[in-house]
Structures are given as C-alpha cells and as structure tokens.
Amino acid sequence: MTGIWDVRITDTSLRDGSHHKRHQFIKEEVGAIVAALDAAGVPVIEVTHGDGLGGSSFNYGFSKTPEQELIKLAAQTAKEAKIAFLMLPGVGTKEDIKEAQDNGGSICRIATHCTEADVSIQHFGLARELGLETVGFLMMAHTIAPEKLAAQARIMADAGCQCVYVVDSAGALVLDGVADRVAALVAELGEDAQVGFHGHENLGLGVANSVEAVRAGAKQIDGSVRRFGAGAGNAPVEALIGVFDKIGVKTGIDFFDIADAAEDVVRPAMPAECLLDRNALIMGYSGVYSSFLKHAVRQSERYGVPAHQLLHRAGQRKLIGGQEDQLIDIALEIKREQESGQVASRR
C-alpha cells in the first residue's frame, strides 16, 4: 500500500478508545475491528492499553485482556496494515518494546509531555536498533509556544524519531494554534523527520484541526473510527476520509468501507458514543488531558461532586497525564466547600 497516500492515517481506536472502554477490550472485538479497518485500507492500526505499554495498573486501570495478546492478535489478523503500539517512558519499559515487536508490532510510538522529550532518547535508540519504525508524541502541545515545541521535536528527531507528532491531548488547540505548531516543527525538522498531528474533539475541531495540520505540512494524521477515544473522542476517521477526499488529499482508505466499519463493527464494541457534552467541553476549554474524563466521573460518583467542576479545577492546576490521582484531592476540596456552604466557582 506504500505510495498511495499523500497523508498516512493511523487509527487509534484500539488504543485511545481503550480509555473510553475502561481498557475492557476482548479478543473478539479487537479481531473484528482490525479486520474491518484493514479491509478498508487503513495503513496503521494502534493497539495498546490506553496509557501505553505497561499501563494496566491500579493508577490507570487494569486491562481485561493483556495488551501483548491483543497486539499479537492484531498482527495476525491484519493482511496489509502495520500494527503500532504506544509507550510512555516511566510507564512502559524497554523490555515491553521488545515483547511488542516479538508479537508483531512494527511501529513504536513513544510519548512524553511536551517539555520532556529528553526522557525518550534511550527508548528511540532501542527502537531503531530493533528495526522498528519510530514515532514521537509531544503531548499537551497547547501548553507551550510553537518554537519551544519545535525545540523538543528536535531532541526526538536527533534521538532517532522518524515522525514527531503535535499531540493535542486536551483538544484545546484551535485552528491557527495547530497550523503554527505544525509549521514550526516542519521548519525545524526539514528532511530529518516527518510531522504528524493527533487531535481530540473536545471543542469539536478534530477534523478541522487535522486539515489545518495537513495544510501546514503534516504527513501523518491520527483519528479513531466513530471518534472512539478519550474525552469527546478523536477526529473520526470516516469523517477525515470524506473531507480529505473532497479536498484532494489521498489517504488510500475507501470512504464507504470505513463508514461501514464505523457503523457495523466499531459502534457495537463501544460502551456508548463519545459525546461532546459539558464534561468534554470543559476539558477542551480548560486544557485538561482527555483521559481524565473517566477518572473524573468515577471520583464524581464516589464523592458526590460535579465532574465538570473537577475537570475545570484540574485545568486550573495544569495537571498532566499521570496525575489523575490528584482528582481525589480536588474532589475532597469541593466536598469540603459544599459542606461549609460555599458555592464552587466555575472560574
């Protein structure tokens, strides 16, 4: 399939969607989804726990099915698509990378907070030694200026990363904010590495932001069929393909086949639709890491406080991925205010 696209699409519904499903995928679902996406022409399918290799834990949530078994199943099922896996240094290990490759994964996507690219250096080195394709994720990209993001991308590229992504983890970037960051990375990296974009729908701009990214020079774009991802979900792949078809951007994915996959295969595996509701909007507006949604809902139910207030305060505190446990502190703070008669502020 190489060479039939202007932009390469990675479907992340079996990784980012794991957040929405509370990491409860079973083999039958993964096999069916991989087969449908592969048949539609999706070139890359990401499969892992929502928080990457090794993410199954008390802090992030336990997987129903071991992720390495799902990676192996996906690789055995796909006829054309490559299987990607995500790892976060400090969550996953180098041994996890080796095992994922042994199970058929061929693209290693390494994610760090957008100011901490240096922690990925040894992992990129290992991935390249193993012959894996490498992708870097600079998460929460809305929190730093384009030129600073580009400097972090340079660290990843020099370490062996072949494509660095601007990752809008909170769905907080708006159009020009995406274009400016992608353009800054393109200018910095030149021919040394490609640039990608990973969006969320928390302000309803996942598709529009992806178009802006491509126009600014991005060569790889993430999405999830049926928006199956954290928060309000990712840019829906079926919509991305429809839009890219209309503006003349080749993806190699058949629009009708991917629309069928979204409706007939992916939707039945989802616990519910990914909604652009108040909680999701608050995350986009306040700049909250999208995977906080389910954690906030759980603490809301546990302590009897509004989830949207938890999320807004998480944004005020500038919490990042890995700090989900601080939602408990925020919930207790709001609970004390309620009991003392104070009205929790939205601002």
From Swiss-Prot:
Active site residues per record: H19
Record-listed Mn(2+) binding positions: D16, H198, H200
What is a GO molecular function of this protein?
4-hydroxy-2-oxovalerate aldolase activity
Q: Which UniProt keywords apply?
A: Aromatic hydrocarbons catabolism, Lyase, Manganese, Metal-binding
Q: Which GO terms describe its biological process?
A: catabolic process; L-leucine biosynthetic process
Q: Which residues bind substrate?
A: R15, D16, S169, H198, Y289
Family recorded in the similarity comment? Belongs to the 4-hydroxy-2-oxovalerate aldolase family.
Q: What is this protein called?
A: 4-hydroxy-2-oxovalerate aldolase 2
* Organism from which the protein derives: Mycobacterium marinum (strain ATCC BAA-535 / M)
